Amino acid sequence: MVNVVLGSQWGDEGKGKLVDLLVGKYDIVARCAGGNNAGHTIVVNGVKYDFHMLPSGLVNPNCQNLLGNGVVIHVPSFFKELETLEAKGLKNARSRLFVSSRAHLVFDFHQVTDKLRELELSGRSKDGKNIGTTGKGIGPTYSTKASRSGLRVHHLVNDQPGAWEEFVARYKRLLETRRQRYGDFEYDFEAKPAEYKKLREQLKPFVVDSVVFMHNAIEAKKKILVEGANALMLDIDFGTYPYVTSSNTGIGGVLTGLGIPPRTIDEIYGVVKAYTTRVGEGPFPTEQLNENGEKLQTIGAEFGVTTGRKRRCGWLDLVVLKYSTLINGYTSLNITKLDVLDTFKEIPVGISYSIQGKKLDLFPEDLNILGKVEVEYKVLPGWDQDITKITKYEDLPENAKKYLKYIEDFVGVPVEWVGTGPARESMLHKEIK
């Protein structure tokens, strides 16, 4: 059994909380894409654990965790995050954590060039806007992967004669191509290979052939949960390109990032914030640059875990959600942070786009069009009631249930979970047929 948790908007929907809720039922939690460029916090027994690269399944002492071949790994950050979690009391994490031998490596010079590239792009653009990268080197690493010049985990841990010398030579060539492209930036070449020679010994016990790992688990009928990173609207192919991340963050990335066939997937859970947020630049049709946006940001505490940046806020965009559903094929939804809407008298939701009076059939791929669309809203009544103490779906205010029902009917997917507060237990389950 393989079930998948995916973000349906622009990230920060609360995927980690759903994974945290579900993880006790699973034998394995796997990540399939991205790196340490996103983050979420899980609270267990009053202890806060911040996850950026590592799978959230580490909070379950009986769960194995895998970083798949589609993940890109900055090895120093891998160990720093692991040590931070261990310092907070996470037990036997090292024996339950595995890394794909096919995963690509992020180096410090990738991070340097990530920031240089961002400055370059903002200087070229007419409005001075940039992509909004986290500066973690994710994009440049995927670039070297696509150009077939990158280094993978197996290159680092290979014990064969001459393998280390080959690693250093390839590392040097990779660095030189960056310098040719961006000029002679400050970087201690001599120190870095020496650092990685130490890290390779530390990393070896974690490394597995992830294809064998996953298929053995599937054959053994293990319960597997895939933890998606980022969200569909940040997908390199289907998101608001170029204001996207550098990997496939939808269901396609699950298959290629873990090496599993489509027939192994059972349930696909789409996580949807009850309103919409976005970090960084790029079109955002339902954004509210007014008191409503500020209110959503304040009540929702909308600041990024990884970057600390303020998130832009707006109303729920059902055009985005329907498009996301078409691609990812959600079998049920988790609506998060519904409580943030508690004090709004009226709650608009975006239901269609038009441009120059002509309604669009679907979410447009052209950002010149997307940036000019007019949004048609359906205004739904608020419930003006604190829902954070409610423990059963049936006890939600009628208008809150109507809000959820409207979402279900619009996208044709049932809501299975509803987030009603920041606490770990503030998640209502609704039976679905």
Curated annotation (Swiss-Prot):
InterPro entries hit by this protein: Adenylosuccin_syn_GTP-bd, Adenylosuccin_syn_Lys_AS, Adenylosuccinate_synth_dom1, Adenylosuccinate_synth_dom2, Adenylosuccinate_synth_dom3, Adenylosuccinate_synthetase, P-loop_NTPase
Residues holding GTP: 11-17, 39-41, 311, 337-339, 419-421
GO molecular function: adenylosuccinate synthase activity; GTP binding; magnesium ion binding
Similarity section: Belongs to the adenylosuccinate synthetase family.
Subunit note: Homodimer.
Compartment(s) of residence: Cytoplasm
Cofactor (UniProt): Mg(2+)
GO cellular component: cytoplasm
Purpose: Plays an important role in the de novo pathway and in the salvage pathway of purine nucleotide biosynthesis. Catalyzes the first committed step in the biosynthesis of AMP from IMP.
Matches recorded under PROSITE patterns: ADENYLOSUCCIN_SYN_1, ADENYLOSUCCIN_SYN_2
UniProt KW keywords: Cytoplasm, GTP-binding, Ligase, Magnesium, Metal-binding, Nucleotide-binding, Purine biosynthesis
Chain positions recorded as IMP binding sites: 12-15, 37-40, 134, 148, 230, 245, 309
Binding site for substrate: 305-311
Name the record gives this protein: Adenylosuccinate synthetase
Pathway where this protein functions: Purine metabolism; AMP biosynthesis via de novo pathway; AMP from IMP: step 1/2
Active site: 12 (proton acceptor), 40 (proton donor)
Catalysis: reaction(s): IMP + L-aspartate + GTP = N(6)-(1,2-dicarboxyethyl)-AMP + GDP + phosphate + 2 H(+)
One family name in Pfam for this protein: Adenylsucc_synt
Domain of life: Eukaryota
PANTHER family with a match to the protein in the record: ADENYLOSUCCINATE SYNTHETASE
Organism: Saccharomyces cerevisiae (strain RM11-1a) (Baker's yeast)
